[in-house]
């Protein structure tokens, strides 16, 4: 599902603000070309498919009212990776590019949905960009009033990371790097140095870290968990079942590839952290694992993209 991007034009401005809406997809055919223009400024391709149901491939079910009216994904064709935006049937969509950072290869996208009677329904914001090796999409929490790429990046940082940056006096420039004195980042995971004495008997080796959405896990050379709830995880139940929920399953299903994990535990890792889409990082000493704030966003269910 992935593509070789073309380089952003060298004469492109460093920062672009696009304060006005690009228009409703149903009403203005120019929207598609405008999206192509803004995505191309960061070296990406985009395809917009209007009036298309998310379908089974996105793993989304429920009534028409419950179904997302927009779904974003990273797909791949013969030319490589591209962004795919699908808008559901019924009502009207507006897609607004709020900010483009060509040199950083990021943009902030706003989606607004209207009903068949033109009543406002909902809005979501998505950070689209390139991180290390591939394009990505991240949903921004709805309670974060961001209008720029920089603001979106800050909004995706967990509170513990923001607090530590403030205490250490991390500069704004350094705060956007993948590694500084406050943290090391790999994809959606932040690793914060921690003073910890772990019981060697409880240290796990070659342990997967997953946010439970079916994406590819990050692998920790050494992992230590403290607290949290014991859950039973399988391909069908990636977010895990409690012991009570697990016991209610038929015996045949309970024997179908479940393994026991901890949910909402304090997680610490040490050594090498690896992931096929990211550069391997080495953590010297124990680090607390914090996930970005994307899971606070209801718009996260509108993403088919899984890291």
Specify the residue positions occupied by each region the protein language model found.
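Short Lys/Arg-enriched alpha/beta "domain-start" segment
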Residues: 3-102
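Extended, non-transmembrane interaction/recognition domains
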Residues: 87-187, 192-195, 201-204
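Long, positively charged binding patches that form subdomain-scale interaction surfaces
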Residues: 166-274
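Tight coil/turn sites that cap or link beta-strands
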Residues: 262-277, 282-302
